[in-house]
Every structure is written in C-alpha cells, then in structure tokens.
Amino acid sequence: MHCDVLWHNAQLMTLDAADGGLGIVDDGIVACRHGHIVYAGAAAQAPALQPDSAHDCRRRWISPGLIDCHTHLVYAGNRANEFEQRLRGASYADIAAAGGGIVATVRATRAADDAALLAASLPRLDAMLGEGVTTLEIKSGYGLTLDDEVKQLRVARQLAALRKVEVVPTFLGAHAVPPGGQAQHYIDQVCTQMIPAIATQGLAEAVDVFCEHLAFSQAQAEKVFVAAQAHGLRIKIHAEQLSNQHGAELAARYGALSADHIEYLDQTGIAAMAAAGTVAVLLPGAFYFTRDTQLPPIAALRTAGVPLALATDCNPGTSPLTSPLLAMNMAATLFRMTVDECIAGFTREAARALGRSERLGQLRAGMDCDLAIWNIDAPADLVYRMGFNPLHARVWRGHLC
C-alpha cells in the first residue's frame, strides 16, 4: 500500500480501544495518505507499506492531535484588574453588577478593528498549537451587536487561514445582555436578526447560550435554540456554572452537542444528557481561577455514561488559560479525573463535543491525520507534570508543522 508519510518505531495512544481507554500500542506505526490515516496500529500487523517519506520516532509517543472544544480566544483587552478585585473578596456577580465581567471585554472588543483583534488573538492560538492542539472551537460573544459578533467570527476564520489548524466557529451572541440593553429585547434580536445573518454567511456551525441567573433564562435559551435549529445550526450551552437553571436538561432535549461547566448539574440533567448523547464539557481552568468550591458531579456522570470532555475555556475574565496540558492536570487534581479521562477529554471526547468524532480524536484508518508526538515516558506524564511542554512535533492533515 502506498502512503505519503509513515511514522514508525512509536508508542501509540490510539484512543480507539473497545473499553474506552487509551488504546495503547507498544510498537506502532501511523501511515498517512492525502491527509488521512490509512493505518494506525501494531507494526507487526501492518500491511506492506510503501511511503514517500518515513520518520523514526525513536520510541516517542503519538496521540491524536489535541482538541480544545471550548474557547473564547478572540477578544481584546485585559481583565487583570478583576483578578485583583476577586482576591480582595469580590464575587463574579459583584464584578458583573459593577459593569465589569463580560461587558468589560465587550467594550474593548467593540473598539478593536479586525487587525487589532487578530494581533491580540494570534499569540493565544500559537500557545495552544505549541502544546499539540490541531483543532479548536472559537466562540463569539464579546460583540453583542450583529456587526461586532460577525467581526469576531471573521477573525476566527482568519486565524484558521494563517495557521495549520481547524477552527470550529460558534455563535455566542447570547453571552450577556449588552450595556444599556434589556434581556428579552436583545434575545429577540439574536433570534430574528443575528442568527439568520450569521447562518446565511456561513460564519458559525453552532450557537451557544449562557443560561444563568445573571445572563439568560431557560425560556430565552429555548428561543435561541428554536431559531438556531430553523437555520441549520447545532446547539451548545453554558449551563449550571453558578446555579441550577436546568439549562443542560433543556439543551439535551434539543439534541445539544454539549453542556459546558455544569458544576450545579442535578440527576435529572445528567439523565437527560445521557439519553441525548450530550457531552459534558468540564472546564477546570474556570473552576480554579474563580476559586469555586462546587465540584461538577463527575462520579454521577461516569455512572450514567455521559462522555467527559475537557477544554481550556480560554477567556480574559475567568480562565485566561492557553495550556491544555495544565487543564489536564487541573482536571485530575481538582476533579479527580483519571489520566485516561484527561487525555480522552482533549481528544476523542472533545471531538464528540464538536460533532467531529467521525474524523478527529482517534488514530485509526479513515481519520484525519492530526497527530501530537511527545517526548514522554508514559501517557501519565502529560497530566502529571506542570509547566512542562514535552511536545516533539505537531502534525496537521499529514504535514509536520
């Protein structure tokens, strides 16, 4: 069998195990043709391969490229002042009520043009790529007008054109009530003006809503979901981060790809997510940074068979984090997730949360050839160590980056 590139003498984490584990292969190879994997597995069981080029991995580990399935990467401004306020005792709600929080970033993002937004966002993207990320989601939500939301999504598209990475755009117009606005009137604008325009321009694949007592109600979220589905957009939700608004249960009824945060998720919401196949996206960076104490119900989610994904939640206010490796460590330490769960959370399950499990997140024939090659002794090293970047090489669509 002809292939363009062959990586051999490697240890693999295929994430393709029947038991849901890492799918470890001790003496493995990965063969790529036209940007897709044609074989990934044990060298001894491989077909005869005729590569145009071959790379000896010298027993390094290969995993699927990392996938960050929840980010707010495109924004302007800085909220270090709010960090200081929280250290002095202010709560998330206190800061938002005083005109800070999301709307502070809205003001800065509205004031920035495309070039300024791109310049601010590229270093954050490059930091993620430097830790093996090959796909990431980018949400809007810091514009809160049609023109400014489109601007954010346009910059997300520009980032994908400038780097070897897949960007999955999500419209998060229902992130906060605009300064001086009224929630119901704004939701009407989101549904009747923004969603149709963004869908027509092909700028987003999904919508997201911040369903919370200081943002939008369950009824308002449902209105967004109805409009989104009418325009062919998929559903995601920020749910149960600060209180139980039953947003995850609602989103699951609409076949949501994921419900994210979910610290206050109850058993009814868990059952709804399990029945719908909705992924739980856990965001330990936000939990850590806001010094939260309400743990997401990890054990109950496991028992129910809800897939567990992880993400950085890169954003300026509650998770200024661009390190998936540190997010894995946080998930293990704070949420007591296992090594296998942490690695799967940034690969196989993250792909599921983005509706891409048919081509991303695993090493097997037919998948896109997105790889991360690591200088580690064992998979646990990716989760165990902090401030350590063992990435040897990143491969996107079969090309070394």
Curated annotation (Swiss-Prot):
Binding site for N-formimidoyl-L-glutamate: 142, 315, 317
Keywords: Cytoplasm, Histidine metabolism, Hydrolase, Iron, Metal-binding, Zinc
Pathway of action: Amino-acid degradation; L-histidine degradation into L-glutamate; N-formimidoyl-L-glutamate from L-histidine: step 3/3
Needed co-factor(s): Zn(2+); Fe(3+)
Reactions the enzyme catalyzes: 4-imidazolone-5-propanoate + H2O = N-formimidoyl-L-glutamate
Protein name: Imidazolonepropionase
The organism of origin for this protein: Xanthomonas euvesicatoria pv. vesicatoria (strain 85-10)
InterPro entries in the cross-refs: Amidohydro-rel (IPR006680), HutI (IPR005920), Metal-dep_hydrolase_composite (IPR011059), Metal_Hydrolase (IPR032466)
Superkingdom to which the source organism belongs: Bacteria
HAMAP family documented for this protein: HutI (MF_00372)
